[in-house]
Each structure stands twice: as C-alpha cells, then as structure tokens.
C-alpha cells in the first residue's frame, strides 16, 4: 500500500474514532444530565411490576427526556413504600389498605419512622378484586370462606396488598388467618400437593390476572369459592365492598361460579411529598390524556379510563387523613373535583 493510501486510511480511521468518541461523550453527558426517577414496585411476576415496567417509557416521554425512569422491584409493596420514604426511590407502588396501615402505623409500619418526606396521594391506577381459589377436588368441601378459616392458605406473599386485604376480611368475619408463605412460582405446586387448601387470586378491573396466576391456571383446573350471603352481609357491615366479577373477563377456563365475588382494593403509585409539583402534574396529565391508549397496553386500565378523575377522588377518600400531592391537587382543581377538606402536602418547587 502506498504512503498516500496509508495516510488516507489513517485519516479516515482517526475521523471514525473521533466520531465515536464524540458520540459517546455526548451520550454520557446526556445520561449525566438526566435526573433519576425510581419507581419501587412489588416483585417481578406481579401485576404491579408489569404495569410500572410498561409505564416507564411513557413517563420518560411525559417528562421530555429530562428523567431516566427505572423500575425497582421489592419483596412486597410494604417494603417498596418504605424504600421510597428511606430515599431509595421517588414513587411507590401501594394501595388504599397499605396507605391506611402506613398512616396508622399498624401492621408492617408499626413504629416505622421515615428518613425522608412521606408519600402523598398522587395517582390511582386500577382496582383489584381479591377472591379465594382452591382445587377442583377441594371445592367439594369448600363452600364458603369460613371453610378456609384456620386452614393453610397462601394469601399472596406477606406484605402484599391482597394479603393485607384478606387480613381485614378475616378480621371482619372473625376467622383464623393461617398464612403459608410461598414463592409465587410455587403456587400451583402447593395447591396440587395439598400443602395449602386455598390460594388468594385477584383480578385487575375484572380483566387481568397476575402472571403467576396465569401460569397456575394453565397447568391445572381451579375453582373460585365465593363468600356466602351471611359473609357478604358481615363484610358490608364492616365497610368493605363486595363486587361482581365476570370470570370470562380474566380466566381462560371454567372456575366454577357464573359470577365471582371479590373484595376490591384500589392500587396506585404515590410519590414522595418532596417530588416537584410540576413533575407529578406532568405525569398525571399525560396519563389522563393517554387513558384510552393505556387500555390498549393493558385492559386493567379500563376502569381508570372510564372515570380517571373519579378514581383519584376515590383513592383520596379512602384515606382523607393522608395529604394530597400538590401535583394531583392542581390536576383535580382544574377538573373541578377538589374538596377543600383535603390537605395538600408540602412539596419541592
């Protein structure tokens, strides 16, 4: 090769290297300039984690690329909530029952003292309906929820919101809550082996099952056991709702009753009070504007899409003693849905 050709090749190579280095430097600088927004959720395989993972890209776009959104799974929502208030995240996966326990410092929050500002009402996304499932064989002897009292049951992992929901359900019914802790993937095995006689199943907006329950349903036939009429009356007297769930909406097989009965809880992703008002507002407004598109991503958003504003009001009213994030307060005032009895949390500018 001639010296001239060598010089040309060398120059071209140097230009390529320079271009790559420049691009890398720009990307690194961009990454360094972007702020971090961490969503803490329940463990991988749960509905809460799946939704947050799907929403991360939408959240980044809503914030104009200013933030890098990451999803951080934890053992359960209780731990995820604490992680945010200990500075390990900015937005926590939670539910109305979890917000109640946190405010009252009961259950997993007994004697808990956050090192960072507390979480505030920010965005409620979907209802879940807790119900009880068993095997086809066991269903012959399990006719009401009282038949699970004192028996080994997987009430979803300890600290999960559905676990907390069934704690208050059994308390209202004066039943013995005998929980067996399992890995999510062991749900079907434990039912088949008889290690547990029941397992709490849950639907989202009556239309979605958690990933581990989809796997369970594929490998075996299950039956949903509805609460009996006297149990429904006691639950309602205790202030708990009991709703109808069409089994065809979430289950792919026959699960017994033509209409299922579940006790709902409202799930959301609540931000720490010191998250800037503008950031929270942008997220909420984007989710509102894209509510019909979100249903296409996941049918669990159907209830939110039908009444986005009403769902936020419902979430606040479940725990009106908990302050509302300024970003949500601004949104609700724009939609004439603000209640002056609610409190607004202090926030960063």
Q: What positions do the PLM features span?
A:
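Bacterial N-terminal signal peptides that target proteins for export
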Residues: 1-15
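An extracytoplasmic/periplasmic, membrane-proximal ligand-sensing/linker region
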Residues: 186, 203-224, 234-236, 278-349
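Ligand-binding clefts/hinges and TM-proximal coupling segments of bilobed small-molecule sensing domains
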Residues: 149-168, 239-309
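Pocket-lining segment of extracytoplasmic ligand-binding domains
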Residues: 96-98, 105-114, 120-121, 137-138, ...
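Extracytoplasmic small-molecule ligand-binding "clamshell" domains
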Residues: 50-86, 255-257, 347
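C-terminal segment of classical bacterial N-terminal signal peptides
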Residues: 17-28
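Bilobed "Venus flytrap"/periplasmic-binding protein-like clamshell domains
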Residues: 36-63, 67-70, 129-195, 203-207, ...
């Amino acid at each position: 090769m001639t010296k001239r050709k060598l010089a040309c090749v060398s120059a071209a190579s140097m230009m390529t290297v320079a271009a790559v280095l420049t691009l890398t430097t720009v990307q690194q600088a961009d990454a360094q300039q972007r702020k971090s927004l961490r969503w803490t959720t329940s463990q991988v395989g749960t509905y809460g984690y799946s939704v947050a993972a799907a929403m991360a890209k939408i959240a980044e776009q809503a914030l104009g690329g200013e933030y890098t959104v990451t999803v951080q799974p934890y053992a359960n929502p209780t731990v995820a909530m604490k992680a945010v208030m200990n500075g390990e995240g900015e937005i926590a996966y939670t539910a109305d029952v979890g917000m109640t326990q946190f405010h009252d410092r009961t259950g997993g929050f007994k004697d808990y003292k956050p090192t960072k500002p507390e979480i505030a009402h920010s965005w409620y996304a979907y209802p879940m309906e807790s119900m009880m499932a068993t095997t086809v064989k066991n269903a012959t002897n399990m006719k009401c929820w009282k038949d699970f009292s004192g028996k080994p049951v997987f009430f979803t992992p300890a600290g999960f919101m559905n676990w907390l929901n069934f704690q208050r359900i059994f308390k209202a019914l004066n039943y013995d809550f005998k929980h067996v802790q399992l890995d999510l993937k062991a749900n079907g095995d434990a039912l088949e082996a008889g290690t547990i006689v029941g397992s709490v199943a849950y639907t989202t907006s009556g239309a979605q099952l958690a990933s581990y329950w989809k796997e369970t349903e594929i490998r075996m036939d299950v039956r949903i056991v509805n609460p009996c009429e006297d149990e429904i009356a006691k639950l309602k007297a205790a202030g708990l709702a009991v709703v109808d769930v069409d089994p065809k909406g979430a289950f792919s097989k026959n699960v017994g009753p033509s209409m299922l009965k579940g006790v709902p809880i409202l799930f959301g992703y609540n931000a720490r009070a010191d998250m800037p008002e503008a950031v929270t507002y942008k997220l909420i407004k984007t989710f509102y504007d894209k509510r019909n598109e979100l249903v296409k991503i996941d049918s669990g958003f159907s209830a939110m899409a039908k009444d986005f504003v009403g769902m936020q009001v419902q979430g606040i009213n479940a725990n009106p003693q908990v302050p509302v994030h300024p970003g949500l307060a601004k949104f609700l005032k724009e939609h004439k849905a603000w209640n002056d009895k609610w409190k607004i949390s202090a926030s960063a500018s």
